[in-house]
């Protein structure tokens, strides 16, 4: 199992994210289910076996990972430095009934430097905290004509005049990046809102690409990535992080592809 967690994020209502407070028999906090709580349960399970007098015929070990959420670099280091791997193992990082497979994961970054021209100039575009979280909030700022605000009309999007332009904010529903269909992606919603503006040049092309080829889709249909199998269902695409720095827009995404498909087939697409 693993002890690292996804970013705490905003919107905690019961407790602070790392308080570990117990209320009505429940522990609240980031990682209580994924995966600190299950790791503690595994320790107690071994203790229960020992107290019951169970004598295993094979050695039992616990491995505590610290980098599962962002690539398992800790395990690569462990193996390359002589760490022992199990003959048989399982991880208490799932649900009941037992999960015996996991989709492949392909993380990447799409970056494009924008040589901006025309009356609309992007100065800020940001949202999300990690590739494996569907973001609940994203915002952009543009230098543009005063009437730009009237050109955007979209649900869960707020446009506010600022000096020399506008600020556009989009709301979503945050969920884990492995199940983006259960949420609403604020970055995709923001791109669709900005695509209503008469953007020109590379800025217009880039925003149209994000809005029309990704947008609120979660299976990569418009990117030509849609694929599925009977065992694990469809490929999913999560747009997790957006950042605009030094005239470059970067989008960090996470693809989960069906268990029966090979990386070599998915990556070229």
Language-model region placement:
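Short helix-loop-beta-strand segments that form the rim/entrance of peptidase-like active sites
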Residues: 49-68
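Midchain, well-structured core segments that form catalytic/ion-binding scaffolds
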Residues: 75-258
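Active-site metal-binding loops of divalent metal-dependent hydrolases
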Residues: 3, 68, 94, 177, ...
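Small-residue-rich helix-loop
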Residues: 266-268
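Acidic/His- and Gly-rich active-site-bordering loop/insert found
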Residues: 1-30, 51-56
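Structural motif
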Residues: 25-26, 60-61, 87-90
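Active-site alpha-helical elements of protease catalytic centers
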Residues: 31-46
């Amino acid at each position: 199992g693993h002890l690292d967690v996804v970013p705490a994020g905003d919107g905690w209502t019961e407790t602070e994210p790392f308080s570990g407070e117990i209320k009505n028999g429940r522990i609240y906090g980031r990682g209580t289910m994924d995966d600190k709580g299950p790791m503690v349960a595994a320790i107690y399970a071994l203790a229960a076996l020992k107290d019951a007098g169970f004598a295993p015929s094979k050695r039992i070990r616990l491995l505590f990972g610290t980098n599962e959420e962002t690539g398992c670099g800790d395990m690569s280091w462990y193996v390359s430095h002589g760490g022992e791997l199990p003959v048989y193992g399982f991880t208490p990082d799932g649900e009941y009934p037992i999960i015996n497979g996991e989709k492949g994961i392909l993380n990447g970054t799409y970056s494009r430097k924008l040589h901006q021209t025309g009356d609309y100039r992007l100065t800020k575009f940001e949202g999300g905290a990690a590739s494996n979280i569907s973001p609940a909030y994203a915002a952009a700022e543009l230098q543009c004509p005063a009437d730009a605000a009237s050109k955007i009309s979209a649900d869960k999007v707020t446009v506010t005049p600022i000096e020399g332009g506008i600020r556009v904010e989009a709301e979503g529903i945050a969920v884990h990046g492995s199940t983006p269909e259960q949420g609403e992606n604020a970055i995709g919603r923001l791109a669709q809102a900005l695509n209503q503006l008469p953007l020109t040049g590379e800025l217009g092309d880039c925003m149209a690409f994000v809005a029309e080829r990704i947008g609120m889709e979660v299976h990569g249909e418009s990117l030509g990535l849609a694929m599925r199998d009977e065992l694990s269902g469809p490929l999913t695409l999560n747009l997790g992080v957006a950042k605009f720095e030094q005239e470059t827009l970067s989008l960090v995404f996470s693809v989960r592809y069906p268990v029966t498909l090979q990386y070599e087939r998915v990556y070229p697409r």
